[in-house]
A protein has these predicted regions:
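Positively charged n-region of N-terminal signal peptides that target proteins for export
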Residues: 1-5
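Bacterial N-terminal signal peptides
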Residues: 7-15
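Hydrophobic ligand-binding cavity/cleft-lining segments
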Residues: 20-72
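Amphipathic hydrophobic-ligand
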Residues: 26, 118-124
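Hydrophobic pocket/interface hotspot
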Residues: 42-47, 53, 79, 96, ...
């Protein structure tokens, strides 16, 4: 009887262990803020247009698709970001999910990107400008999964690679805004 109970306990433990290791990736989150030496309205005027990402140094051009599509209609406005690159035409396609000009905020999601360009899947983010003692505080936060959805991802598609890539994008954008407006320490 004792052997049978030990066997059942061992089998149950092994089943639980294999289930725990087979859960797949966890949603990652990146949230960054910067306070700029400008009014919130001045900064929103630069970054609040879904059809214009020219303020970000990685973006060569922004194209609304299809041509003539609305620029500020949630679930309809779609942009294609053409990225600066030495070869090829890497792109990221994003759809507007929500926009609130009064709150100086919009939410968007990536609908198409090659993991070689950005090693993430199911990415959505919010970009918002708030007033902080008369200065502009910019919040950029996103949630996403790594580029490889299964267990044992290659190094370039793991959680660390996804977080590093998104952090680098946000930081490059913030650095460009700080250069343009000045950063409040």
């Amino acid at each position: 009887m004792l052997k049978a109970m030990f066997g059942l306990t061992l089998a149950a433990g092994m089943a639980l262990a294999s289930t725990a290791s087979a859960h797949g990736p966890s949603r990652q989150k990146t949230q960054m803020t910067i306070t700029l030496d400008a009014s919130p309205t001045e900064v929103w005027e630069v970054i609040g247009h879904f059809d214009d990402m020219s303020w970000h140094p990685a973006v060569a051009s922004t194209e609304m698709t299809p041509e003539g599509a609305p620029v500020d209609v949630p679930d309809e406005s779609t942009r294609v970001l053409h990225l600066k690159a030495e070869s090829g035409d890497p792109t990221i396609t994003e759809q507007l999910m929500k926009i609130d000009p009064d709150k100086m905020m919009y939410k968007y999601m990536i609908t198409d990107v090659a993991v070689e360009v950005l090693p993430v899947t199911n990415y959505s983010a919010t970009l918002q400008v708030s007033d902080k003692d008369g200065k502009a505080e910019v919040l950029w936060k996103g949630g996403y999964y790594r580029g490889f959805p299964n267990n044992d991802p290659p190094e370039e598609l793991n959680d660390d690679a996804a977080v590093a890539a998104v952090t680098a994008i946000y930081q490059a954008g913030f650095d460009a805004l700080a250069e343009r407006f000045g950063k409040v320490e």
